């Protein structure tokens, strides 16, 4: 039985502390941030702890010293002054029309107008109302004002499919934030969070002294949970997870890493786990796709299809730092949005060339994203997918029998609607790769070796499968390439059985025509 409470669905620092929920101490980084900067921006994926950080800052600036007992902030802060805090949580609304935006902003501003005895004048522009609130808070308390804006970009994301609506929303939001520069002398600290950096809102051009800490090494783990934090704080929880799943401690830790670790938000920063998925797993003792199941923007999947991009395109992407700053308002390149949304992360960084390598952070994201993308390939009958998963689990997971599994895959291909089949080699490779990812397989594509690139590799606990996929040739031709290039020799010392798998796809049949599975 769990001896502690996990803050599932609780994002407010004060509620977490007073409710005796698990809290991983980030107060030292928060203290450093507010004492090194006056204007800060942080972007992180959804459900990654941004709101918790914002409410932590609110509690700190409101001087609630009792909430920080035993935390790093207690030793770092000596004065504990109380400042007026304006906390605008933009995520409270859904912004599918201008009426929704006006209702949300009116409600947020009216709360503070009432607090400082200002007459609520809905007809006034948002910038005037926010400016009046800042001035009143400063005049009535004698202290500089703190402005915390959580999910500032929520209206922009909700209106992504409607350019005209987004333009109206952009103008309204630009107007709202404009006093943050003019009222600088009345402000102690300004902090904005979001998923994306919407450059055309003018926040980043008008507030020319704003510090974007999103990709700074020293703040890389200000949200999320590092490996050191995991093993030092949650050791007993991991042991219980291991016992419930009939694993050793090391196996459970490895499985957590495989599923939920792998996020890097700077070139040389800390490697972090997704806190939402991690807490759900430890609370339930079940490995599952918790974060991904909370929602994938359909516009991203649609955009990838429009640009004819697939899962093979999204791993091992090369990017410069400039690519991360591409304006999100007009999505020409999906990579910045995929990175900011948490579907891609930094896998490697070369400080000399300043080149980043991007890829999927972990199994949860890779499998979940392939599942979302696969609906463009899959048969309409959802039961077919379930049948394929059952075959995969029985043939490969339980019995390591590729020869028995491929006929099930062949049957699945045969049921694809003709409208979803592009008759070319790349299409069949992408579908094969995406399908196995969706099933949860540890599969890798285009793996470099000294003699070329292995088409695909599939790893199980007992075996390694070396694939070569051909189109309008034969399984013999595919097998011949594996042998000529000595692809399998790289795994001779692995300890697992190694199999060579040659597969040929037919244009006429639009599916797998022939295959060979040969042990090394």
Task: Walk through the language-model features, giving the residues of each.
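Domain-level recognition of nuclease-like catalytic cores that cleave nucleotide substrates
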Residues: 490, 494-520
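Structural motif
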Residues: 146, 463-465, 499
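Conserved catalytic cores of phosphodiester-cleaving nucleases, focusing on short active-site segments
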Residues: 432, 456-471, 485
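Phosphate-binding site recognition
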Residues: 1-424, 439
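Active-site metal-binding core of divalent-cation-utilizing nuclease and nuclease-like domains
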Residues: 137-141, 433-461
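Mg2+/Mn2+-dependent nuclease catalytic core
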Residues: 166-171, 471-488
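Metal-dependent nuclease catalytic cores in nucleic-acid-processing enzymes
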Residues: 176-183, 336-344, 433-437, 441, ...
């Amino acid at each position: 039985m769990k001896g502690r409470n996990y803050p599932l669905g609780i994002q407010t620092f004060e509620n977490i502390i007073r409710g005796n929920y698990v809290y991983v101490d980030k107060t030292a980084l928060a203290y450093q941030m507010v004492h090194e900067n006056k204007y800060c921006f942080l972007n992180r994926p959804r459900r990654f702890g941004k709101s918790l950080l914002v409410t932590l800052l609110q509690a700190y600036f409101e001087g609630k010293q009792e909430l920080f007992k035993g935390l790093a902030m207690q030793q770092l802060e000596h004065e504990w002054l109380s400042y007026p805090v304006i906390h605008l949580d933009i995520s409270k609304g859904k912004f599918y029309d201008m009426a929704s935006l006006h209702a949300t902003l009116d409600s947020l501003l009216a709360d503070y107008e009432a607090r400082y005895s200002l007459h609520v004048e809905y007809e006034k522009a948002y910038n005037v109302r926010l400016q009046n609130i800042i001035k009143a808070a400063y005049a009535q308390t004698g202290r500089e004002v703190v402005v915390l804006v959580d999910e500032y970009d929520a209206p922009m994301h909700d209106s992504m499919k409607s350019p005209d609506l987004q333009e109206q929303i952009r103008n309204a939001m630009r107007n709202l934030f404009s006093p943050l520069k003019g009222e600088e002398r009345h402000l102690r600290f300004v902090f904005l969070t979001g998923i994306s950096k919407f450059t055309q809102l003018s926040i980043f051009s008008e507030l020319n002294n704003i510090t974007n800490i999103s990709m700074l090494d020293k703040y890389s783990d200000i949200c999320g949970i590092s490996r050191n934090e995991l093993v030092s704080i949650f050791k007993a929880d991991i042991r219980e997870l291991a016992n419930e799943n009939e694993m050793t401690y090391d196996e459970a830790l490895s499985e957590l890493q495989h599923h939920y670790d792998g996020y890097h938000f700077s070139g040389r920063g800390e490697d972090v786990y997704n806190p939402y998925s991690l807490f759900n797993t430890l609370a339930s003792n079940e490995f599952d796709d918790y974060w991904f199941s909370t929602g994938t923007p359909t516009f991203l999947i649609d955009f990838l299809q429009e640009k004819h991009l697939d899962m093979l395109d999204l791993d091992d992407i090369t990017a410069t730092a400039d690519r991360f700053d591409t304006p999100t308002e007009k999505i020409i390149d999906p990579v910045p949005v995929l990175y900011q949304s948490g579907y891609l992360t930094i896998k490697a960084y070369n400080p000399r060339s300043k080149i980043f390598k991007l890829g999927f952070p972990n199994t949860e994201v890779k499998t979940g994203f392939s599942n979302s993308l696969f609906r463009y390939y899959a048969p309409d009958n959802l039961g077919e997918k379930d049948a394929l998963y059952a075959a995969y689990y029985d043939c490969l997971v339980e019995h390591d029998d590729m020869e028995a599994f491929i006929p099930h895959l062949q049957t699945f291909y045969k049921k694809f609607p003709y409208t979803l089949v592009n008759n070319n080699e790349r299409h069949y490779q992408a579908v094969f790769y995406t399908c196995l990812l969706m099933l949860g397989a540890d599969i890798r594509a285009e793996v470099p070796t000294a003699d070329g690139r292995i088409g695909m590799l599939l790893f199980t606990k007992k075996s390694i499968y070396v694939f070569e996929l051909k189109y309008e040739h034969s399984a013999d031709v595919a097998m011949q390439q594996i042998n000529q290039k000595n692809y399998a020799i790289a795994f001779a010392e692995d300890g697992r059985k190694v199999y060579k798998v040659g597969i040929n796809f037919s244009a006429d049949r639009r599916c797998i025509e022939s295959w060979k599975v040969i042990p090394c």
